[in-house]
Structure formats: structure tokens, C-alpha cells
Amino acid sequence: MLIGIYIAALLLGYLFGSIPFGLILTKIAGTEDLRSIGSGNIGATNVLRTGRKGLAAATLLLDALKGTAAVIIASSFGGAEAAMLAALGAFLGHLFPVWLKFKGGKGVAVYIGVLIGLFWPGAIVFCLLWLATAVTARYSSLSALVAAFITPIFLWWFGHPALASLFAVLTLLLFWMHRENIKRLQAGTESKIGEKK
């Protein structure tokens, strides 16, 4: 019975996470295919490169909310363990959506969204770290990497070892998805916030 619940939670999370809101919103707005501009990513940062700040904000919000919703729904029928599996599923769904031949986003908004659903103070810490790094360095990718690196440590320090383990895995995946950004940061060629590629 529990195995069935856990599988359902993982699949629920994956299906929620795989909804490509950035692509959907930009198509509705009549902009060019998001995958053909900037980084080719379907997330909010690349939507911002279209010059449509409202669309970028909506993408960020909806990508976060799909993670939060998956966690809350899974928690309602399967408890904390199911919620964590839904979080993992949502993150994987965003990174590797079946609808887009498994080529999705980099996961920052969904990371925040599932963190809101599982332990909202952690999401506040993540956002504050992101903001502080963004203000000082003006690199969206670096801001996300710094915040994601510290988040599992914060969760462990405040007595949530299971969540710390989950977010350590999510952080590793997030770093992998940002591997090209890391190379550009090292080379000094990464685009700053507000710049078009």
C-alpha cells in the first residue's frame, strides 16, 4: 500500500513539474519560441531575455507554485515521505519533461516551490541568499548556486536531516544543470541580470 502511495506521489510530482509554463506563456503572448533565444532554456531567466518582465515574473511564480502544489497534494494523501517524493518528482519533471523530449529548465523556481511546501523558512533563506548575491554580483546563475549550496546546510543545522538529504540531491542536480553557466562564470563570459545574450 505504501509503495503504491509513494509511486503515486512521485508520478504526481513529475507530471506537475513537467508543465512548461515559460514556453506556454510566451507562446500565448506571441513571442518567438523560447527555445530559440538566449540560453534556449524554458525558465524565467530566459523569458526575461524576451524583454517581457511580466511574463518572466509569471513564469517564475507558476514554476514555483507547481512544485508547492505537488508537495501539498502528496502530503494530504501520503504524509511527509510522499511530500518529499513529490518534491523530487516535480524537480525531475521540470528538468526532464516528457513533453519536450526531456529538455526542460534548470530548476531554480521549482526548487524554491518545493521548499515552500516542505519547509517555508528554508525558502525565505534561499530567496534572501539569492537576492544578496544578485545585488552584489548581478549573476542570476551564481545567485542560485550560492543559495542552493547553503540551503541543505541550513536544513541540517536546524534539525531537518531528511530534508537536508533531499535538497543536497536537488542541489547536485541543479549544479549539473548549470554546468555551462559555471564554465562561463569561470571564463568571465556569463550574462549579468538584465543583459540579453
UniProtKB/Swiss-Prot annotation:
It is a multi-pass membrane protein. Keywords: Cell inner membrane, Cell membrane, Lipid biosynthesis, Lipid metabolism, Membrane, Phospholipid biosynthesis, Phospholipid metabolism, Transferase, Transmembrane, Transmembrane helix. Belongs to the PlsY family. The chain crosses the membrane at residues 5-25, 54-74, 80-100, 112-132, 153-173. One of its GO terms (cellular component) is plasma membrane. Its EC number is 2.3.1.275. It comes from Rhodopseudomonas palustris (strain HaA2). The keyword Lyase does not apply. InterPro entries: G3P_acylTferase_PlsY. This is Glycerol-3-phosphate acyltransferase.
